[in-house]
A protein has these predicted regions:
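Bacterial N-terminal signal peptides that target proteins for export
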Residues: 1-8
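C-terminal motif of bacterial Sec signal peptides marking the signal peptidase cleavage site
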Residues: 17-18
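Long, low-complexity, acidic Ser/Pro- and Gly-enriched intrinsically disordered regions
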Residues: 22-40, 84-177
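Conserved small-residue packing positions in alpha-helical repeats and bundles
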Residues: 52-53, 69
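Hydrophobic/aromatic side-chain positions at a characteristic register within alpha-helices
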Residues: 56-57
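Short, charge-rich amphipathic alpha-helical segments embedded
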Residues: 61-62, 66-90
């Protein structure tokens, strides 16, 4: 699937969010430096994915990467903890967005592996300072820690394998920054 078609597919999924999820909380705007104005952290993880797509379409690749991984972290905690109240509709929606948006953003993000790793650190910092009110962090502490640890491990994996990843990208005709 071509990148623009993936973005359009993600847009269609988000457009029908109301059908799968119901009302999505949030909508206020906060400024997260250097990633710009975004929905407040109390928004459903799908809104963070949608914002990532908008940032990518606007040419703000680092911001798109940040909001994709912020959405992914929130989605995994939300879906992984029974006390969060996630529904089957949430699981289907977030899975579709992860696949569609991730397949569009990751090739862009990993053109700069060191930059992507730095952005993941920023996501982890943001997550600690901007809790989502729809997640019961006391009841979900083990899940939250496990998901955060997974992102830390993934970050380290890409740094440890950066040379191989760059070489593979070159072999596949993808640019490195």
């Amino acid at each position: 699937m071509r990148p623009m078609h993936m973005l359009l597919s993600a847009g269609v999924v988000v457009m029908f969010l109301g059908c799968a999820q119901g009302d999505v909380p949030g909508g206020d705007v906060a400024d997260v430096k250097p990633y710009g104005a975004v929905p407040q952290p109390d928004t459903h993880p799908s809104v963070l994915y949608e914002h990532a797509v908008q940032e990518l379409e606007a040419g703000r690749e680092d911001s798109a990467t940040f909001w994709f991984y912020a959405g992914q972290l929130r989605a995994r905690v939300f879906l992984g903890c029974e006390e969060s109240g996630a529904t089957d509709g949430d699981e289907q929606l977030l899975g579709a967005l992860f696949d569609t948006v991730g397949n569009t953003i990751n090739p862009v993000a990993f053109a700069d592996i060191d930059g992507a790793a730095s952005i993941m650190t920023d996501v982890l910092d943001w997550d600690l300072t901007h809790p989502a009110p729809y997640i019961d962090y006391e009841a979900c502490s083990a899940t939250h820690e496990e998901v955060r640890d997974g992102l830390v491990e993934f970050r380290q994996h890409i740094l440890d394998n950066a040379d191989d990843m760059r070489r593979t990208r070159e072999e596949n005709g993808l640019a490195n920054r």
